[in-house]
Amino acid sequence: VNADSGRMNGEYKILKSDGTDFTGHSGGIVSFGRYVYLTDGYFLYYIPQIALSGGSKNIRIEGEIRLPVSASFITVFDGYLWAGNFYHKSYANNFDVSVKDGYGKQYRTLIAAYRLDAKKRGGIRTSDERGTREAVIYAALAAPDEVQGAAFLPNGDVHLSCSYGRGVMSSQFLYSYPLKEECDGVVSVGKRVVPLWFLNNDRIKRSLSAPPMSEGVVFKNGRSYVIFESAAQKYRDTAMDPTDCVWAVNW
């Protein structure tokens, strides 16, 4: 969709690199440099941005990179691609790392930082693990449950979009940029030990309630823009206050 006119530029069907249909979750999507990135579980897929020119068509994934932490949302900031998992208590084993902050609160959402590198294939620094290219994690943020989307403001503040359930109000949180401070500790992810910061009450700046089923978020031109899943065909008849609009948040 053209951001200025509001008109649709094209609709794209995504194919795997072998030409078969891509049927993954596509929990997160972001564009940076030469590529559009999307996630599905433990894999990050990349598509050349140039493939999206010329209107509606099929586009093919160029390659994939394995992730050490499952990813349901992604964003880009300060030279890193940040990807995190979705955790809710009803999914007992849906996490890779469990850590406690200084107050004893448990965190099972981990937002991992992977270094962007235009010189590398796929634009991400990787190592060769088990014959598969795996993204190298450099740092991590421990975040609250139910994160559906994340975005960084220009000053580094972190906006988290959190929701779960068709009849439960979603929450939007704004945290101060943690990496300008000394890390809160370290965390082991695979074979690496990386610095860890908590997005907890010590760093929260603002919070607000929003309609149910908030999903991805992006920051542009001074505002956060949040999309919702409630008006999707699958949910619109049963969700509370379904909305088919993109909502703007002026922090």
Regions found by a protein language model. Give the residues of each.
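Short glycine/acidic-enriched loop and turn motifs that connect beta-strands
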Residues: 43-45, 88-92, 164-168, 231-235
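Blade-level signature of beta-propeller repeat domains, shared across WD40, Kelch, NHL, RCC1
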Residues: 214-251
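Beta-propeller blade signature
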Residues: 1-5, 47-60, 96-122, 169-193, ...
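Blade-loop segments of beta-propeller domains
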Residues: 2-34
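Surface loop/turn motifs at the tips and blade-to-blade linkers of beta-strand repeat domains
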Residues: 12-21, 62-67, 138-143, 199, ...
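Repeated scaffold domains used in trafficking and secretory/extracellular systems
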Residues: 20-28, 64-76, 144-149, 209-219
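Loop/turn-rich, solvent-exposed surfaces of beta-rich toroidal or solenoidal domains
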Residues: 138-207, 213-215
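Residue-level detector of Asp-centered blade-edge/turn motifs that repeat once per structural unit
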Residues: 31-33, 76-78, 152-155, 219-221
